[in-house]
Every structure is written in C-alpha cells, then in structure tokens.
UniProtKB/Swiss-Prot annotation:
Family membership noted in the UniProt record: Belongs to the bacterial ribosomal protein bL32 family.
Organism ancestry: Bacteria, Bacillati, Bacillota, Bacilli, Lactobacillales
Organism of origin: Lactiplantibacillus plantarum (strain ATCC BAA-793 / NCIMB 8826 / WCFS1) (Lactobacillus plantarum)
GO function terms (MF aspect): structural constituent of ribosome
Keywords: Ribonucleoprotein, Ribosomal protein
Name of this chain's protein: Large ribosomal subunit protein bL32
Record GO biological process: translation
Single GO cellular component term: large ribosomal subunit
Amino acid sequence: MAVPARRTSKMRKRNRRGHIKLATPNLAPCPNCGELRVSHRVCPSCGYYNGKQVVKVNN
C-alpha cells in the first residue's frame, strides 16, 4: 500500500480545506409580515408563501 513521501504541512492542509465551509442562508423579508425568512420557503411566523396562506400558524 502506498505511503505519503512527505508530511502534509499545516499551510497546505489549511489551503485545501479553505473551500469546505457552510454557506450563509439566503434571508429575505416576508412581503406579508416583514419577518426575515429563507428564500423560496414558507414564512415560519405567518405561514404565507407566494401571497397565499399555506400553513396555519398558532400565535
């Protein structure tokens, strides 16, 4: 079985892992209530999506 010839340095390892990260969620204000919500999802505070109430929310 093959063995690495040289030890991978901290810098090389960190440069390689620089692209492995979480993306920030795309938040947009809800046109119905104004709360921030994730784009293309039902608003968790009012239950509206695309101008229609989709989910009944208990306040």
